[in-house]
A protein has these predicted regions:
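C-terminal beta-strand-rich structural cap/linker in extracellular carbohydrate-active enzymes
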Residues: 433-455
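Aromatic/acidic polysaccharide-binding cleft in carbohydrate-active enzymes
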Residues: 286-377
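Aromatic-lined substrate-binding rim segments of carbohydrate-active enzymes
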Residues: 63-67, 74-131, 151-186
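Short, acidic/polar
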Residues: 55-71, 114-124, 194-210, 297-305
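Hydrophobic faces of well-ordered beta-strands that scaffold small-molecule active sites
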Residues: 47-53, 77-79, 101-107, 131-135, ...
């Protein structure tokens, strides 16, 4: 776990009758006012939504974890063997059976027991519940011993690199488990020596301490928390920027891990490659602190999932389901407070995933929708999804965290037979319905509008 940010704004989505004349910028429309957009399956987005939880240890209970995971609609859980003496097959089986979640499974902090991870992962595979392997958690904070050598932290990272090489090779040599991807080491931007962990596979001529061609992982992994500490001040587009693969990301993002490492400046991929590289976030989030109350935290959580998916992250796991009770400092990261008291974030994610719920066993034939958002503010973003029913879901969200609102209009190339507008911070029922309409107007500050569209 780690970082923080602040802000204040809680405006409700309000329907307006006319578009505004604010000075705005188009977003991802290639400079065009109107574009035909291919929808992504709703299930692809929902499958990306993950959560950190200790499940049944560290003061958490299985029944409450099941309740929280089911209510939140989370599709995967980040797990590992850390803190457990053995794999509790019954716990994982029950959590999977009652919620349908899959599990990433890994070493945790300071662990190197590859045999244990392989055996546990195989059991998850056998129950149809395995998603991916995960490697070391933040070896800058929790070093390891590999082949008798200390690595990570202030030591050389060569033992870390050798461990990862060996772990990856072991997974990929297994005739059954090799089908699953490896999520990489987190916070590798901290490496003290240039062992090449900034690459998935070290390319020819990289000049690293490990040889060219060394294979490490299938997905880059960041812990890109959307804040930098309890004293930070919220900025506009904060969660959008935290999801950026570029050097405009002020947090622990892909640029500082895979392009130019933030600790020692070791060079890795070029920026264009990182934009398109497979990547995940096994930890992100924000605490409650000055400027970020329960409402703002809940809105930011939804914006994190949306921004991450829109900007190319395959999987995102927010830290954490329920606040830690065995660690010091500000631990208000959770959807639930100690005692499993639901915060507003828990209600918002429930409403959000309920509105978007779809049959995960069916496939979606990608359709297109032609629309525009004239004079769109740079703090307004959009994502087009489609359910297996054929209905489109255009999600519009605002990141004007410093205050104020903008009036915007979404215009379609033809009249839509029905457009229903949902606000997940209010509930699961539509707040307005529009028939035979060619445009919808909204007021956006730090708001989320889900438009259910039937042509």
């Amino acid at each position: 776990m780690k970082k923080i940010l602040q802000g204040i704004l809680t405006s409700t989505i309000v329907m307006f009758t006319a578009a505004c004349d604010d000075e705005l910028k188009p977003d991802n429309f290639s400079g065009q006012l109107t574009e035909t957009v291919t929808a992504k399956p709703v299930n692809d987005f929902l499958n990306s939504i993950g959560i950190n939880t200790a499940i049944y240890t560290r003061g958490e209970t299985l029944d409450k974890t099941i309740e929280g995971v089911k209510d939140g609609g989370f599709r995967w859980v980040r797990a590992g063997y850390e803190g457990t003496a053995f794999f509790n097959n019954g716990v994982f089986q029950k959590l999977h059976d009652e919620t349908g979640v899959l599990f990433s499974y890994g070493m945790g902090s300071g662990g190197t027991d590859t045999a244990r991870v392989m055996a546990d992962a195989r059991k998850l595979h056998e129950m149809g519940a395995f998603l991916a392997f995960e490697s070391l958690n933040e070896p800058n904070n929790w070093g390891i011993i590999w082949d008798g050598e200390a690595g990570g932290g202030e030591n050389s990272w060569l033992p870390v690199a050798k461990f990862q090489r060996d772990f990856y090779a072991r997974v990929k040599s297994d005739p059954v488990m090799s089908q699953y991807p490896m999520f990489g080491i987190s916070t590798i931007g901290a490496e003290n020596d240039n062992v090449g962990l900034q690459y998935l596979t070290i390319p020819e001529g990289a000049g690293t301490l490990m040889p060219d061609g060394t294979q490490y992982y299938d997905y880059g992994n960041c812990h890109n928390y959307a804040f930098g500490g309890d004293n930070d001040v919220l900025r506009d587009n904060q969660t959008w920027l935290a999801s950026s693969p570029g050097n405009d990301n002020p947090f622990d993002g892909p640029y500082g891990n895979f392009v130019k490492t933030w600790a020692k400046g070791f060079l890795g991929y070029d920026e264009e490659t990182v934009v398109n590289m497979p990547r995940v976030s096994t930890e992100t989030g924000v605490t409650i602190h000055t400027g970020v109350d329960e409402d703002m935290q809940g809105r930011m959580f939804l914006n994190i999932y949306l921004s991450q998916f829109k900007r190319g992250w395959a999987y995102t796991s927010i830290y954490i389901l329920r606040d830690r009770i065995d660690e010091g400092g500000n631990q208000t990261y959770g959807f639930y407070a100690p005692g499993y008291v639901a915060r507003k974030a828990a209600h918002y994610i429930h409403n959000f995933t309920t509105i978007l719920a779809d049959d995960r066993d069916k496939s979606t034939t990608a359709g297109t929708l032609t629309y525009s958002i004239p004079k769109k503010p740079e703090t307004v973003h959009h994502l087009l999804l489609q359910k297996t029913t054929g209905k489109y879901y255009l999600i519009i969200w605002g990141e004007r965290y410093t205050g104020g609102t903008n009036n915007i209009s979404i215009s379609f190339d033809q009249n839509m037979s029905s457009v229903k507008v949902y606000d997940p911070t209010i509930g699961t029922e539509a707040i307005s319905t529009h028939n035979n309409t060619g445009s919808i107007s909204l007021e956006m500050g730090v708001d989320i509008a889900i438009l259910e569209i039937e042509k």
